Amino acid sequence: MSSNNSNQDNFIRFALEAKVLSFGEFKTKAGRLSPYFFNAGGFNDGARLSALGRYYAKALQESNIQFDMLYGPAYKGITLAAATVIALADAGLNVPYAYNRKEAKDHGEGGVLVGAPVKGKVVIIDDVISAGTSVRESVDLIRKAGAEPTAVLIALDRMERSGTAAEIGAKSAVQAVEEEFGLPVISIANLTGVMSFLTASSDVQLSNYLPAVKAYRDKYGI
């Protein structure tokens, strides 16, 4: 489930300007040669983070998912959850958020979870879903707290089947998460949107990457 075309196009443009979305030749962790790269760590100043929070908030509100709070898995998810709840508050919806520590504390407030009490319907927020490990850990922590995971919110759905360069799985990581946990995955943008953006772009240098992206999707995409 991706955001509407306007929000998606604006986000893709924003990611390109921030050099978070790049085109060229990049080797993925799975050993595949990808014609594009998405690195959410490039949203690294106040203005970019503020804008990013608004894109996440808009995608979440447009999804019509019912939720009570956000949860950001360490480490990237912490900043994303904070930015998004600020954007939601600016839009008139004040919701709590929480996150986890990588290692439990045995002093002070202790425990693994930090922030608001984890309860009600919880949206997990992250940048992308690669192997789904972060989501599985988050679902486990949320359920152990007695709350209900209700959706996963990400920036980009690569729409790419799992596996390696040689061994290609039947499903994408997003599809696997949706099937395993019965949770909808909401994305601000997806690969279909990126390809549509390239197709419509008046920037020849940018649109020249479309054949490589299409070939990559034909080989590894869903």
Swiss-Prot record:
<comment type="pathway">
    <text>Pyrimidine metabolism; UMP biosynthesis via de novo pathway; UMP from orotate: step 1/2.</text>
</comment>
<feature type="binding site">
    <location>
        <position position="130"/>
    </location>
    <ligand>
        <name>orotate</name>
    </ligand>
</feature>
<feature type="binding site">
    <location>
        <position position="101"/>
    </location>
    <ligand>
        <name>5-phospho-alpha-D-ribose 1-diphosphate</name>
    </ligand>
</feature>
<dbReference type="InterPro" id="IPR029057">
    <property type="entry name" value="PRTase-like"/>
</dbReference>
<dbReference type="GO" id="GO:0046132">
    <property type="term" value="P:pyrimidine ribonucleoside biosynthetic process"/>
</dbReference>
<keyword id="KW-0808">Transferase</keyword>
<feature type="binding site" description="in other chain">
    <location>
        <position position="29"/>
    </location>
    <ligand>
        <name>5-phospho-alpha-D-ribose 1-diphosphate</name>
    </ligand>
</feature>
<dbReference type="GO" id="GO:0004588">
    <property type="term" value="F:orotate phosphoribosyltransferase activity"/>
</dbReference>
<keyword id="KW-0328">Glycosyltransferase</keyword>
<feature type="binding site">
    <location>
        <position position="107"/>
    </location>
    <ligand>
        <name>5-phospho-alpha-D-ribose 1-diphosphate</name>
    </ligand>
</feature>
<dbReference type="InterPro" id="IPR023031">
    <property type="entry name" value="OPRT"/>
</dbReference>
<dbReference type="GO" id="GO:0000287">
    <property type="term" value="F:magnesium ion binding"/>
</dbReference>
<comment type="similarity">
    <text>Belongs to the purine/pyrimidine phosphoribosyltransferase family. PyrE subfamily.</text>
</comment>
<keyword id="KW-0460">Magnesium</keyword>
<feature type="binding site" description="in other chain">
    <location>
        <begin position="126"/>
        <end position="134"/>
    </location>
    <ligand>
        <name>5-phospho-alpha-D-ribose 1-diphosphate</name>
    </ligand>
</feature>
<feature type="binding site" description="in other chain">
    <location>
        <begin position="75"/>
        <end position="76"/>
    </location>
    <ligand>
        <name>5-phospho-alpha-D-ribose 1-diphosphate</name>
    </ligand>
</feature>
<comment type="function">
    <text>Catalyzes the transfer of a ribosyl phosphate group from 5-phosphoribose 1-diphosphate to orotate, leading to the formation of orotidine monophosphate (OMP).</text>
</comment>
<feature type="binding site" description="in other chain">
    <location>
        <position position="102"/>
    </location>
    <ligand>
        <name>5-phospho-alpha-D-ribose 1-diphosphate</name>
    </ligand>
</feature>
<feature type="binding site">
    <location>
        <position position="105"/>
    </location>
    <ligand>
        <name>5-phospho-alpha-D-ribose 1-diphosphate</name>
    </ligand>
</feature>
<feature type="binding site">
    <location>
        <begin position="37"/>
        <end position="38"/>
    </location>
    <ligand>
        <name>orotate</name>
    </ligand>
</feature>
<keyword id="KW-0665">Pyrimidine biosynthesis</keyword>
<feature type="binding site">
    <location>
        <position position="158"/>
    </location>
    <ligand>
        <name>orotate</name>
    </ligand>
</feature>
<dbReference type="GO" id="GO:0006207">
    <property type="term" value="P:'de novo' pyrimidine nucleobase biosynthetic process"/>
</dbReference>
<dbReference type="GO" id="GO:0005737">
    <property type="term" value="C:cytoplasm"/>
</dbReference>
<dbReference type="InterPro" id="IPR004467">
    <property type="entry name" value="Or_phspho_trans_dom"/>
</dbReference>
<dbReference type="GO" id="GO:0044205">
    <property type="term" value="P:'de novo' UMP biosynthetic process"/>
</dbReference>
<comment type="subunit">
    <text>Homodimer.</text>
</comment>
<protein>
    <recommendedName>
        <fullName>Orotate phosphoribosyltransferase</fullName>
        <ecNumber>2.4.2.10</ecNumber>
    </recommendedName>
</protein>
<dbReference type="InterPro" id="IPR000836">
    <property type="entry name" value="PRibTrfase_dom"/>
</dbReference>
<dbReference type="Pfam" id="PF00156">
    <property type="entry name" value="Pribosyltran"/>
</dbReference>
